[in-house]
Amino acid sequence: MTAETERIGVKGGMEYSFGFTKIDEAQKQSMVDGVFHSVAENYDKMNDILSLGLHRMWKNSMVAWLSPPAVFHWKVLDVAGGTGDIAFRILNASRQKAHATVLDINGSMLSVGKKRAEKNGLAPLIDFVEANAEHLPFEDQSFDAYTIAFGIRNVPHIDQALREAFRVLKPGGRFLCLEFSNVEMPLLDKIYDLWSFHAIPKLGQLIANDGDAYRYLVESIRKFPKQDDFAHMINHVGFSRVSYRNLTGAIAALHSAWKI
C-alpha cells in the first residue's frame, strides 16, 4: 500500500486527493463537481453498483435510527442530498409533517431532486439549496437534525463541514452520517475489492459512459477514514455521544452524534 492509497487519518487530508491521485487543494472541488455532473441522471444506478443494491436498505436503517417525529416545525437539513433520496424517506417517516432542506453544491443533482419531489407530491415540504457544505448559508441553531449520506467523503475539508454541521444544529440536535467504510472481514474485503476495482469502472462506462467517474468514486471510498478515526473527527468539533454502526460487514458505516 502506498501513501496515495492509504486511508486518511484523524488529521484529514482528503483535500489533497482525488481518489488515489494527489492534487492541489484548489483543484478538488471542481474535479468532484465534474464527477457528479456526469453521474447525476444515473445516481441511483451508481449507488446500486457501488453497494450491490444494498444502499436502499442502509438508507432505511439511517432514517429508522433518526426516527423523525411526526410533528410540524421539526426541521432536517440533508447535505449532499441533491436527488432527495434521504429527504423523501425522512418526510414519509414523519407522516409528511416535518420540513426538509436539501443542500447540494451540484446543480445537476438538485435538478434531479426537484423533479422527483414534484412527481412524488413532496415539493411543498422541501427547500432545495445550492451551496457548499463547508459554508452553510443558514443561521446558527436552525435545524433539529443534519443528515448526509455518501457525501462527506467528497467534501474537500471534512473538518470544516463537521464544524458547520455542529453550528447549524439546535441544542439537542442530531447528526447522522452514512458512508462507505472500512470492511473489517478479510474475505469480504477481498471480494469487495475485486468488485470495486475491476467490475465497477467497466459498469460505469457501460451504464453512464464514464468509467473514470466511477473509478474516482471507488478510490474515494478507500481514502475515507476508518470508523474510529471518523468518530474522533466528529467528537473533535464538539459533538457528544458519538457512536457508529457497521452495516453489511462494514461495507458502510452509520455514524451518530448529538449537539448537547
Curated annotation (Swiss-Prot):
Q: Enumerate the InterPro entries for this protein.
A: SAM-dependent_MTases_sf, UbiE/COQ5_MeTrFase, UbiE/COQ5_MeTrFase_CS
State the source organism's domain of life: Bacteria
Asked if Transferase is a keyword of the record, the answer is: yes
EC numbers on record: 2.1.1.163, 2.1.1.201
Any single Pfam family the record assigns to this protein: Ubie_methyltran
Q: Which residues bind S-adenosyl-L-methionine?
A: 83, 104, 132-133
User: Do the record's keywords include Protease?
Assistant: no
Query: What GO terms are given for molecular function?
Result: 2-methoxy-6-polyprenyl-1,4-benzoquinol methyltransferase activity; demethylmenaquinone methyltransferase activity
Q: Which UniProt keywords apply?
A: Menaquinone biosynthesis, Methyltransferase, S-adenosyl-L-methionine, Transferase, Ubiquinone biosynthesis
Which SUPFAM superfamilies does this one have? Answer: S-adenosyl-L-methionine-dependent methyltransferases (SSF53335)
Q: Which reaction does it catalyse?
A: a 2-demethylmenaquinol + S-adenosyl-L-methionine = a menaquinol + S-adenosyl-L-homocysteine + H(+); a 2-methoxy-6-(all-trans-polyprenyl)benzene-1,4-diol + S-adenosyl-L-methionine = a 5-methoxy-2-methyl-3-(all-trans-polyprenyl)benzene-1,4-diol + S-adenosyl-L-homocysteine + H(+)
Give the pathway listed in the UniProt entry for this protein: Quinol/quinone metabolism; menaquinone biosynthesis; menaquinol from 1,4-dihydroxy-2-naphthoate: step 2/2; Cofactor biosynthesis; ubiquinone biosynthesis
What's an example GO BP annotation here? aerobic respiration
Bilayer-crossing residues are none
Family that this chain belongs to: Belongs to the class I-like SAM-binding methyltransferase superfamily. MenG/UbiE family.
Give the function comment from the record.
Answer: Methyltransferase required for the conversion of demethylmenaquinol (DMKH2) to menaquinol (MKH2) and the conversion of 2-polyprenyl-6-methoxy-1,4-benzoquinol (DDMQH2) to 2-polyprenyl-3-methyl-6-methoxy-1,4-benzoquinol (DMQH2).
Looking up NCBIfam families in the UniProt record yields:
MenG_MenH_UbiE, PRK00216.1-3, PRK00216.1-5
HAMAP family per the record? MenG_UbiE_methyltr
Name of the protein in its database record: Ubiquinone/menaquinone biosynthesis C-methyltransferase UbiE
Give the originating organism. Bartonella henselae (strain ATCC 49882 / DSM 28221 / CCUG 30454 / Houston 1) (Rochalimaea henselae)
